[in-house]
């Protein structure tokens, strides 16, 4: 991972799951991704659980009394106060007062104008977050029914370069780039869903190639995961979208199985 001083603005720098049942959530992700866990305290003295993999920090879990929430992705900023001001200026909402977590930095939750929640983080000097390895975060996609709003907001906030990789009509799938490197994607939600579905970020975690895609999927289902959409090929690897036993959606991905998903008529992997 890049150092704090060189981490590009707009780059994912943390992933956090608020959960109403910390114990069962730990059990599930331990069995599927091999995570271990340790407890820290934030600047207000509240306990905070950090997930590790072979000693490397890969995610955070936070006890939350309330309904099940999605994985929260945090994006790096250079100045949290200035970025929060820009969020409001560009049509978003700041949802809370900033918090400081040792080993991470100052962070705050926002809603973009399309209604999806995401975090901003000004990394601390001792910031540590491992991505791109088996069992860790390797990709994330914003799924929203209001794609133009999302593109404009995040483009203004982070200066993302944006490229449409689908036909833009039947399937609208845009990749966001930082300094020429693809970092995130935005997907238009299926507009024909029978019921309204809120916009959400889908965190993608890499499978262990020594275990394999199919075996990891079976482990997830045996541990209580629900299949949300059958496995599909993509330009970033073979993907399956699941929900954990409490209902939080996430994806497993095998980056070694890359295909051009738009060589044939595409299916919407987020069709609810």
Residues of each region from the PLM?
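Conserved short beta-strand elements that form part of the metal-binding/catalytic scaffold
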Residues: 35-68, 113-124, 164-199, 208, ...
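Short low-complexity stretches enriched in small and charged residues
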Residues: 28-32, 65-66, 96, 158-161, ...
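DNA polymerase sliding clamps and clamp-related checkpoint/processivity subunits
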Residues: 53, 59-65, 73, 77, ...
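Short acidic, gly/pro-rich beta-turn/loop elements at beta-sheet edges
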Residues: 25-27, 61, 84-85, 150, ...
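Core segments of cupin and vicinal oxygen chelate
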Residues: 2-9, 16-56, 89, 97-105, ...
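Short, surface-exposed, charge-dense and proline/glycine-enriched linear segments
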Residues: 68-76, 125-134, 154, 193-204, ...
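Vicinal oxygen chelate
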Residues: 1-7, 11-20, 50, 63-86, 90-141, 164-182, 217-272, ...
């Amino acid at each position: 991972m890049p150092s704090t001083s060189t981490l590009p603005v707009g780059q994912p720098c943390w992933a956090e799951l608020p959960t109403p049942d910390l114990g069962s959530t730990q059990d599930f992700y331990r069995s599927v991704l091999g995570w271990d866990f340790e407890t820290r305290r934030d600047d207000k003295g509240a306990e905070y659980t950090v997930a590790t993999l072979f000693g490397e920090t890969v995610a955070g879990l936070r006890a939350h009394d309330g309904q099940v929430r999605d994985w929260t992705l945090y994006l790096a900023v250079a100045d949290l106060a200035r970025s929060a001001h820009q969020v409001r200026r560009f049509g978003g909402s700041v949802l809370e007062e900033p918090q400081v977590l040792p080993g991470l930095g100052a962070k705050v939750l926002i809603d973009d104008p399309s209604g999806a929640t995401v975090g901003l983080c000004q990394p601390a000097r001792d910031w540590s977050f491992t991505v791109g390895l088996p069992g860790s975060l390797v990709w994330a996609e914003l799924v929203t029914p209001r794609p133009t709003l999302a593109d404009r907001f995040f483009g203004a906030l982070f200066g993302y370069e944006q490229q449409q990789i689908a036909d833009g009509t039947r399937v609208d799938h845009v990749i966001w780039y930082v300094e020429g490197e693809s970092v995130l994607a935005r997907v238009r939600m299926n507009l024909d869903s029978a019921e309204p579905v809120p916009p959400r970020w889908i965190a993608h975690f890499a499978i262990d190639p020594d275990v394999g895609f199919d075996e990891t999927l079976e482990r997830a289902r045996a541990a209580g995961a629900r299949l949300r959409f059958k496995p599909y090929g993509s330009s970033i690897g073979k993907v399956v979208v699941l929900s954990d036993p409490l209902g939080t959606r996430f994806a497993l991905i095998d980056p070694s199985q890359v295909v051009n998903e738009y060589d044939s008529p595409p299916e919407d992997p987020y069709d609810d």
